[in-house]
Amino acid sequence: MTATISLATLFGEARSQNGWLDRDVPDARLREIYDQMKFGPTSVNCSPARIVFVRSMEAKQKLAGAVAPANVDKVMNAPVVAIVGYDTRFYDRLPELFPHNPAVKSWFEGPEKAAFAETTAFRNGTLQGAYLIMAARAVGLDCGPMSGFNNAAVDAAFFAGTTIRSNFICGLGHGDPGRVFPRSPRLAFEQACTLA
């Protein structure tokens, strides 16, 4: 990716999508998204995000069975739906990902540290999910993030027998501008921020 990306592309002009054009998203584009998002910062480079790119009809039907009724159409019609998950055992990879501190794995290991590890995985996996959205927009795709689904059902369908848990799902493709709602208001700086 060599193009200069504007803030408007990433934020101001980008919209959450409700419908999709019939345009393919090649595997190479998904790899490009990951190869950019992986460089976003995470705590001790823990990189807990695990992503399933759902694109086959069979996999979409499996996912559609676990989403809220309002999201079924969005799942079935998106060229790709990313299931953004996080690995609660992310720390098993820390010797590889954070090699300058040999003790780093011990910060998260053991039953007494399970809550800390879970919080770390969820927080940093969420960050990486946001990086996925920014990377997808940067390479010219639109996004439709969704949280209206049954996490336990998605985990059973896609992550059974693993230590990965679902966080949110996100349609990826070329959005149908006719299906986008008018932009909703946002909070002003003074409403959301404090200078201390």
Curated annotation (Swiss-Prot):
EC numbers on record: 1.-.-.-
Q: What is the lineage of its organism?
A: Bacteria, Pseudomonadati, Pseudomonadota, Betaproteobacteria, Burkholderiales
SUPFAM superfamilies (UniProt xref): FMN-dependent nitroreductase-like (SSF55469)
Q: Which InterPro entries match?
A: Nitroreductase, Nitroreductase-like, Nitroreductase_HadB/RutE, RutE-like
State the family named in the UniProt similarity comment for this chain. Answer: Belongs to the nitroreductase family. HadB/RutE subfamily.
- On the tree of life, the source organism's domain of life is Bacteria
Q: Which HAMAP family match?
A: Oxidoreductase_RutE_HadB
The gene it comes from is hadB
The cofactors required by this protein are: FMN
Q: Which PANTHER family match?
A: MALONIC SEMIALDEHYDE REDUCTASE RUTE-RELATED
What this protein is called in its record is Putative NADH dehydrogenase/NAD(P)H nitroreductase HadB
Q: Which UniProt keywords apply?
A: Flavoprotein, FMN, NAD, NADP, Oxidoreductase
